[in-house]
Curated annotation (Swiss-Prot):
Localization, UniProt: Cytoplasm
Gene (UniProt): BIA1
Protein name, per record: BAHD acyltransferase BIA1
EC number(s) reported in the record: 2.3.1.-
Keywords: Acyltransferase, Brassinosteroid signaling pathway, Cytoplasm, Transferase
InterPro entries linked: CAT-like_dom_sf
Tissue specificity note: Mostly expressed in roots (particularly in the root elongation zone), and, to a lower extent, in seedling, leaves (especially in hydathodes), siliques (e.g. in developing seeds) and flowers.
Transmembrane segment boundaries: none
A GO BP annotation: brassinosteroid mediated signaling pathway
Major place of residence: cytoplasm
Pfam families: Transferase
Physiological role: Monitors brassinosteroids (BR) responses and homeostasis, particularly in the root and hypocotyl in darkness. Promotes flavonoid biosynthesis.
Length: 435
């Protein structure tokens, strides 16, 4: 079901108190992150106040929250963030649709409408670092709260930390959180001359295909079957992420090969949150920034690969990164070591199929409560040409045991992918969110 939204208001929300700093140093990883928003949409089916009161409370609490997350109210200037209190953009919209009807007949193509609208041709460098859009459904049936934050300063873990703090402030009137920013704690700052050398993320000249985003749901029973199939002597008990990512990569690779006269090498890049792998004395678990690393899996153009083989390589490479982190912590070289690892993939030839995979599982999306309960559903969308990439994002289902996979592929590959019977043996294409 397509959602037709009408924007009813747009304003800039500034921090309730002035920024305590003038600038925030960006790391070399921040600057290499693409000029895109990291975005999530929270859907709520119960609002205890009127839409006017709810919206006003969100604005007031956002202002208070920005006082703690003050860089998000700033703007990027060169190699740092100017903490100039320019503010975040707050957009309000309405739709006549009822939330239950929308979730029962979900049209994933319409989800981008719940994200902030960017001016045509506007450079990512000019975007606000934080944009919020609140959409009220018809007859008081629910509300969607979307949060988009620049990937130049935040990863998904940072976004969740921010939204939880904002929700707590809305619901309880205050938050006692102490916020720390990663800056160059892990990754070093770039040399001052490097700014002119950075590749532009403002151009879409390299985008030659139309990309399509689809949602697939893995129920717990099917995940158990898949894990059993993915098991091997070297990895007798795969994780659900290992099993699902391996299946998706195999099927996506097969879809690509079916559309190519000459098969290409395939590389899968799996992102990792290093907060979970470093002691809190180095960086707190809820530190704000891009604290990501990862590892790659490579297959030659003619290689055939089965799921247990992919899982075994997945586990081996993941453990290699974990061991590298432990060793580099002792020598205080963690940032340089992880950058070298990521450079292996970045330097790959452009004539390859590159798949960017990220697991958002175990992130507390469903704990985001603005005062009237947990979300009925958490959705994902991308909304600009800069988000066009072959990628996969995994998110927990509300019950926590199932997984929703959001998969972006070139249109011609997706038309084959959605009919892959090996995939459909374990996943359902876009089932209703509510019965």
């Amino acid at each position: 079901m397509e959602a037709k939204l009408e924007v009813t208001g747009k304003e800039v929300i500034k921090p309730a108190s002035p920024s305590p700093r003038d600038r925030l140093q960006l790391s070399i990883l921040d600057l290499y992150c693409p000029g895109i928003y990291v975005s999530t949409i929270f859907f709520y089916d119960l609002i205890t106040e009127s839409s006017e009161v709810f919206s006003e409370n969100l604005k007031l609490s956002l202002s208070e929250t920005l006082s703690r997350f003050y860089p998000l109210a700033g703007r990027i200037e060169g190699l740092s963030i100017s903490c100039n209190d320019e503010g975040a953009v707050f957009t309000e919209a309405r739709t006549d649709l009822l939330l239950p009807d929308f979730l029962r007949n979900l049209n994933t193509d319409s989800l981008s409408g719940f994200l902030p609208t960017l001016a045509a041709g506007e450079s990512p460098a000019a975007w606000p670092l934080l944009s919020v859009k609140v959409t009220f459904f018809g007859s008081g049936s629910g509300v969607a709260v979307s949060v988009s934050v620049s990937h130049k300063i935040c990863d998904i873990a940072s976004l969740v930390t921010f939204v939880k703090d904002w929700a707590t402030t809305t619901a309880k009137g205050k938050s006692n959180s102490t916020i720390e920013f990663a800056e160059t704690t892990i990754y070093p700052p770039p040399p001052s001359h490097m700014y002119e050398q950075f590749p532009s993320t403002d151009s879409d000249s390299n985008i030659t295909s139309k990309y399509v985003l689809k949602r697939f749901v893995f129920e717990p029973s099917k995940i158990a079957e898949l894990k059993h199939k993915a098991a091997s002597e070297s990895v007798p008990v795969p994780t659900r992420v290992e099993a699902i990512m391996s299946l998706i990569w195999r099927c996506a690779r097969n879809s690509s090969r079916s559309n190519l006269l000459i098969p290409r090498q395939a590389v899968m890049w799996q992102a990792m949150d290093i907060r979970l792998r470093i002691p809190s004395s180095v960086a707190p678990k809820d530190v704000i920034g891009n604290l990501q690393s990862g590892f790659s899996l490579k297959k030659d153009a003619e290689s055939e690969f089965e799921i247990p083989e992919i899982v075994a390589t997945f586990r081996k490479n993941k453990e290699r990164v974990n061991e590298m982190i432990k060793e580099s912590l002792q020598g205080n070289t963690i940032g340089q070591s992880l950058l070298s690892l990521m450079a292996e993939t970045v330097s790959e030839s452009t004539e390859i199929d590159r798949y960017i995979m990220s697991s958002w599982c175990r992130k507390p999306f469903y704990e985001v409560d603005f005062g009237s309960g947990s979300p009925v559903w958490v959705g994902y969308a991308s909304h600009t040409i800069y988000d066009n990439m072959v990628g996969v994002v995994l998110i927990d289902s509300k019950e926590g045991d199932g997984v929703e996979a959001w998969i972006s592929l070139p249109e011609e590959d997706m038309s084959v992918f959605v009919d892959d019977q090996e995939l459909l043996a374990y996943a359902v294409l876009n089932p209703p969110v509510v019965a």
